Amino acid sequence: MDAMISGKPMPIQSNRDATSSGWTKIAAGIFCWFFLISCSEQVDPLLQKANEEWVQGRNHSAIEIFNEVLKNHPSGTQAEEALFRLGEIHHFSLNNSTRALIYFQEVLQMNRMGPFSYPTQKYIAEIAEFGLKDYDQAIIEYQNLINHYKNENEGSDHQYRIASIYYKKQNYEQALVELNILLENYPDSSWAEESKFKIIEVLYTLSRCPEAREQYRHFTLEYSDSRFKEDMDFVVASCLEEEGHLQEAYNRFKSLEGRYIYPAILKMKLVGIEQRMKKNP
């Protein structure tokens, strides 16, 4: 859930780690790849050795062997894998995302539709957003994922990231557009509920409170037990406060006591409204 400062919500954040593949999944992926590739072509023993070295945490030894694989196989699937693993080592193990980006870009240059293309493009997008904080480039890279890889299960993830980035850039109107695109193109997405909640937040941020309240009304009918209920109640109360409906706003804020995740902010709201009502009884 997002905190709010001075009544305005903080930037949209995914509650899913953008680099959630994790070491266990990476290691599992390495050995699954061995199984698959062994059915179609002979695996260079050096490639297997390099992967084993990385799994064991011997990063520099793995790098040396992967580079030897590239000398022996300057093109083809094994070269693509060597470049891809070099990118992963530098990104995850050596915390050198700039160097990792070079390897990942080489993978795409070698074969944009190869077996490592999609995860490579995901890494590039994530590095642009979270590592380099180059938000304009990150939007381009996430859009590339949507345009070039028709993965319905993850397309909504990429669309959500685009909306989130526009919010980070404080381009709230475009964030609203992107959230609506998500709902239109991926109506059954696991992001649908959260996106509808974020739309309410964005409308409030844009001081479009009547629209925010209308969206809130539809939301509560559709998601009666939403995990965002307290956050939405806070937004609606904030709208009422901004519009001068102080008693109603106060009552809504008061009802959140013991339930809202940020009690200090809630207390600040209540005290502020109490002071306003004393000045203007």
Residues of each region from the PLM?
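Sec-dependent bacterial lipoprotein signal peptides
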Residues: M1-I37
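Acidic, polar-rich low-complexity tracts and alpha-helical solenoid repeat scaffolds
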Residues: A3-M4, P9, F35-P281
